[in-house]
Amino acid sequence: MKKISLLFLICGLFLVSSCIPTQTIKGDGNITTENIPVSEYDCLELEGGGMVVNYTQSEAPEGLEIKTDRNIFEKYEFNVENHKLKIRPKKEFRKHTNFRPTEFMVTANSRNLKKLAAAGSTHVNINSPLQAEEF
């Protein structure tokens, strides 16, 4: 009897947890391109959906260009903390939000890249040979 009760409890918890509402934000089709000034970074941390990243290692100053729907752009943050370039949804959109952009193109470059971390449906293109002490 205890096993059956435990089974019903587990099934009930599973059903309740699967009912957590998620929000889907679709791109509005108003594609915009923004150049964002960034300081020196050697790590890329990417989070979100539908993102295509084109990275180039070069001696040029660090750069970041974002091309996406205006309504998607407004819900993301782009900043460098402790030499890590972080591209991710703003805090209020990190949980239970699906992004479906019309287009989400990130073009980034830096002098050095030690680490790359991506979460979500992100495609990364490395457009140059990488020279790194560790990777």
Where are these regions (language model features)?
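Intrinsically disordered, low-complexity terminal regions
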Residues: 2-135
